[in-house]
């Protein structure tokens, strides 16, 4: 006698052996209707998730021990927008989108409404005659030490990524640099992109010829990529005292 576990169903008259076989075996069932979880959860193993009809990965889930926070997705009626929310047991729950690699991007298509932005910045207490400004790392760089000479600013992606690789043609990036002068008037006299000197277009029509003594000078740079390794750079120097 066959003692294996099977699924039987009634066709209205007879009890029919579905011949599925042992439940312990792996099967890929095909549904001809909606699947209702009857107000229960679907349990997904760590690093497993949802694949498409070609067996390609679409969504993966990872497990956090004793997790109390999660993501909630809500649909919307006509005229409203669906919502992805951070929810859970904590009072304040953020939402982090992490890209892969230095050149990974978070792309928002359509109009974007932002209530507030916190920008990453770097504070350095070491003066550099050639300051490599890593635009993939920060939007504000504060050189919190007095200048010892005039200096060069080199705009790049980071130590291993050229700005030419990080920016597409037609894109731009803006950076701010804060430098301190004690009783000296040193200033940024050379601007480079990926190590190549560029002639910037300066606010007011002329490049500065010095810094401001006993002040903090703030430089802003907007690099617009117009072609491969070709940039228009807008620059300004503003005294704060």
Regions found by a protein language model. Name each.
Residues 1, 6, 22-23, 28, ...:
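Parallel beta-helix/beta-solenoid repeats that form elongated, surface-exposed shafts/blades used
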Residues 2-24, 38, 219-227, 231-241:
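Short, low-complexity N-terminal tether/leader segments at secretion or assembly junctions of large
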Residues 2-5, 128, 212-216:
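Solvent-exposed, conformationally flexible loop/turn segments
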Residues 4-5, 46-47, 92-94, 137-138, ...:
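Short, surface-exposed beta-edge/turn micro-motifs
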Residues 194-213:
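Terminal beta-strand-rich extracellular "head" domains
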